[in-house]
Amino acid sequence: GGEILFIESSLSEGKGNLSITGNLGKIMKESAVIALEYIKSNYQDLGINKEIDYSKYNIHIHVPEGATPKDGPSAGITILTSLVSLFTQKRVKKNIAMTGEITLRGKVLPVGGIKEKILAAKRAGMKEVILCHENEKHVVEIPTDYIKDIQFHYVREMSEVLQLALN
C-alpha cells in the first residue's frame, strides 16, 4: 500500500509468548515468527546476548492504527529490525523507511507496490529507503525530481539492512 507503518516491539517477563497486534493478517504475523526465529538462529552475529532465555520473556510486536487491516510480507525486514533493536538496544535511525520480505536464512526478497511505498515515504519526510536489490527496477520508474532528496539502499541480506538502519 501507500502508507507508512510504524512497528513497535517490547519485551516483558513472561512465558515465551509472542503477541502480534494491530489488526494484522496471517502473512504479516508469519513475518514476525520468521523474524524471531532468524534472531534465535543468528543471535551471535547480531550481537545479542546468548544468555537470553526466550522462554522467560514475552515479546509483543504492535503495528499502530489497529482500525486499519494490514497484511502481506512487506514489513518483514522492518519487524526484524525492530526486534534486533529491542534485543541489542541499538536505536533505529530516524527518517529511514524499509520494505522487503525476509526468509529464515536472512535473505531479503522483493515486494510489490514499490512506487506507492516510496511516495508514502517521501510524504512522511523519509531521507533514506532500504529495498531489496530486485526492486531497484521499480524505483527508476519514479520521476527523478520527485525522489532526489531520498537516498536508496538496495540490499540482499538482513545483515546489510541492520548495518544501514541501526545506530
Predicted segments — roles?
Residues 3-167:
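Peripheral, non-AAA+ core regions of ATP-driven protein-machinery
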